[in-house]
């Protein structure tokens, strides 16, 4: 399966892409730990089946020195011992915020309480925005058939 459309080759798509990238900078430059950002991005992408984004965030984690066992266990984080309570709370929010059609009422009060226990308001804002942004990025990747495997570390460095 080949990519259906190169969004950035289109004027509207290119404008959207630039603005979408600018919103990424707000999150990247936030106080939310970089490792947490990448773990959440990877988990959202796994849930959504976006090979392109799984490729990106797996390689970014590895390139930052994240141990392979943690990268490999993101998909089964609930059944592992390698994530901190703060990371577990962020991963729970990522899953519940991604699977909103599968859950009622979306993000549970219990998960929200866990997240509030570990993150201040600025970190929480960045985390919520990251989950929303990754869901949007995954949908773009899946709709356009962006395939995983070709990403090179730092390709989108800001």
Where is each model-derived feature located?
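Hydrophobic alpha-helical segments
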Residues: 1-158
